[in-house]
């Protein structure tokens, strides 16, 4: 009977695990295989053996080329930089917002959460194109800055790294807010009431109760924000210049413009490896936070 109980979770999880293997692991293995083909040489034509790659070949030439390609390392560096900056901005702006929503009365909380969620109901293209107009040389932002006398010429807010950061932050921050809010909702507010009853101020209660117990949720939100930002495509593609390319954008260009599938696949593998390393490094403090505060938050 005990063995059957131990087996039950695996039985329930089996369909999901199988689905993940089919939809994630198999395409990843195919991506690795394509990266080991010889390139098609940019010839005209379409399909396997045409201009994409030469089937049946095995080579590490693409990887050795990437290792010595300064262009690739510049793109990778910008991608990581963008991920870190966007994740930091999402946490800096998202935590206070989530905390504010958490403190709202119940009747206003649903409206505030709805306002966060509604930003994800429109198409990403519509959102970014709208932002492109807002950040344009003659858009509302530059018009206001000029009217207020803060600038004498339009600021370059689009086709720049600034525009990419703003756009990607706008796309990612709703997830950050929702994840942190969900973590805060698990906290027992009677702890704060008890602290106030003992004479603790709001700042002391936040620093010694709310913040420590919300650290696991904060760590999870940071990781999710970083993963989303590292895979940025639409924001750098529409709001950046050729100097603000991410790996996701260059993969698309290599595969569909240059028709060099092995290089595009190898860059995709590089992005996957980079993301895996960052997640592995992040897992160490995250696991420590879960051990130190996660169980305490659950049992408090």
Language model segments and positions:
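Transmembrane-helix boundary motif in ABC transporter permease subunits
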Residues: 1-4, 82-117, 133, 190-192, ...
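C-terminal transmembrane helix and the adjacent membrane-cytosol boundary/short C-terminal tail
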Residues: 2, 10-11, 181-192, 196, ...
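Interhelical loop and adjacent transmembrane-helix boundary motif
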Residues: 4-9, 49, 60-71, 237-283, ...
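Short membrane-interfacial helix/loop motifs at transmembrane-helix boundaries
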Residues: 21-70, 134, 138-139, 144, ...
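N-terminal signal-anchor/first transmembrane alpha helix
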Residues: 1-34, 100, 110-115
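Membrane-interfacial helix termini and adjacent extracytoplasmic/periplasmic loops
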Residues: 50-52, 60, 128-169, 203, ...
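Transmembrane alpha-helices
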Residues: 15-18, 24, 115-118, 170, ...
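Non-cytoplasmic
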Residues: 27-31, 128, 176-179, 217-249
